[in-house]
Amino acid sequence: MNWLTTTQRQQIQEYAAKKPTEETCGFVLQGGAVIEVENVSKTPETHFEIGPSDYLHADIAGIEGVWHTHLELDGFSPLDQQVLAGDSLPWAVYCLKSGKFHQCNPNAPAPLLGRPFCFGVYDCYSLVTDKLAELGVQLPQWPRGLYGEWNQPLFKPFDDEALNVGSPVLDELYQEGDILLMNLGDHPGHTDHVGVFVDHQRFLHHPAEKESRVDRFGSWWKRKTRLVLRPTALWKS
């Protein structure tokens, strides 16, 4: 997950300090060199864009990862996350205001607790699949739609897919590996968030734009839970 070295982080901070009013960007090349390239975005104070020639030259040298900076936003932006979800390269963003780095490496396993949110790579469903993989249960990839689409009233992918992987737990005797289907948004009637039990009263989940964590399955979460499923492989015969 954290793929930058201390020296590489320091170099990125130095590049960022030279341009405090706009986003800077660049690559980490094979061998560890950190380079800055021109941000050709028409709105460099809020976005970054790398020109094709710079990308080509870096590709010839061998790209290990992509980095850029944010002036105020602490973390990957929605646009960053959409692009990252379709990319195989590690990404990093440095926030000048907070002084924090956020890193995402889709090629490396991430810890279940404390992973950063990155839609399509580190999100609520990928956390569920990773936890269940530890239990020997392989789940298919569910469609997520576009970033933020889970807040729309007609968002149904999770509900459409859920009963294909397990059956409802009706007696509230929950166990490790049971999947929670929840609605946390403004539009009831559909699932917009999922989690997974780690024991009969605590569950693991990854809220949008926050780090993954474990919460107690108290009254508030019970009200937000639409259904609990037990994967087929975990039902005792």
Regions found by a protein language model. Give the residues of each.
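Glycine- and charge-enriched low-complexity intrinsically disordered segments
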Residues: D215-S237
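Conserved beta-strand-loop surface patch within small alpha/beta domains used
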Residues: M1-I63, E72-N107
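Surface-exposed patches in mature extracellular/periplasmic domains of secreted proteins
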Residues: L139-R144
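Mid-chain, well-packed structural core segment of small domains
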Residues: H57-A85, E172-F197
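Second-shell loop/turn segments in exported
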Residues: L112-C118
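...with weaker cross-activation on analogous glycine-rich loops/strands in unrelated enzymes
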Residues: G145-S212, G218
